[in-house]
Amino acid sequence: IRPAALCAAANRSFALYRSRKEAHVHAEAMRTALTEQYSAMADALSVLSEQLGRPGNPEPYKSGRVAAFFASLGTPPLECAVTLDDLGRTRAAVTLPRTRFSSPELAALAQETGRICRRDFDPPQVLSCKGMTTLLFCEKPALRAVFGTAGTAAKGTVSGDAVQQFCSPAAAQMILCDGMGTGRPAAVDGSLAAELTARLLKAGFTAELAARLVNVALALKSDEESGATLDLISVDLYTGTARIFKAGAAPGFLVHGGRARPVGDISLPIGILGGVNGQSRVVHLAAGDYAVLVSDGLLVDGPGWVAKQLELSAAAGDPPEKVARILVETARARAEQ
């Protein structure tokens, strides 16, 4: 027996076995991720097709009057449709030969089209494609969203937090993602999760479906484990209904009637498991309320002081940008004590 040769052969055999085992595990993970991705896409397409299948109840009289108005301006529409959706909201879509409009012109068109339809319209969304311009008029929502954000990284580090805030035609969306770990890899994961979630929401995906697709994207991003928390709130600006979705995120806060309360349960981040273990909740917001998303770094001393500060800010009527700045500055001061 030659011990050295035997050990070398055993090492080679074990290395080959381990390599094959890792390849098998990686292939299995890829199959699971792709299956989850296709399943999420199928569910998303089902939801989108259902939405497209409910275009609303047509209102031919108003459609004719709106078409006549545009014709009187010297731009007879190629198509004109005024519809009433299931929630009683009036929408108008006018397709014209490709035309450029200034902001004052769009505001004037919205005012006159709204007068014809007996509704208060926002300036229309303008879509241009293949020599045509489509103007999409929607009713002004009952609520208006005002955003604010503030953040800071620990000394000598890069923050893994990423924020997206925007309004879609019917809802205000706010996203906060915190990449797992520290440094630039965490920042990359957080930014990827926030940006991809925002793009999916703008395309009409629900929070749950967006989370499933982002989960797959993080899982397939690299051979190393990638993960991020997902904190999302979507507020219907017509009804005030707010849908909160959290996956691994720190508790948020709602300020209603001047009283602050934490919201959110314990869950796992996205990107570390084959599925998404998120928590959903529906609440109602009114004018003057605050919805606050925070990362775990703000809660090192617990949520009590945050709730008290939010109630003070609500009593003073502070704008969201000021509220966010006060919370971050106070958290930093408390951490340095």
Describe these PLM feature segments.
Residues 93-94, 172-176, 244, 291-294:
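Short hydrophobic-aromatic micro-motifs
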Residues 226, 232, 243-246, 251, ...:
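Generic detector of multi-pass transmembrane helix bundles and their immediately adjacent loops
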Residues 87-91, 142-144, 169-173, 286-290, ...:
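Short hydrophobic/glycine-rich mini-motifs in sensory/regulatory modules
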Residues 128-180, 185, 191-195, 278-281:
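N-terminal entry segment of metal-dependent catalytic domains or homologous docking segments
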Residues 179-203, 266-274, 285, 289-335:
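Active-site-proximal, acidic helix/loop segment immediately C-terminal to a metal-coordinating Asp/Glu
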Residues 57-88, 108-110, 114-131, 187-257, ...:
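Catalytic core of PPM/PP2C metal-dependent serine/threonine phosphatase domains
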Residues 139-161, 211, 215-221, 250-282, ...:
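PP2C/PPM family metal-dependent serine/threonine protein phosphatase catalytic domain
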Residues 1-117:
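Soluble C-terminal extramembrane regulatory/interaction domains of multi-pass membrane proteins
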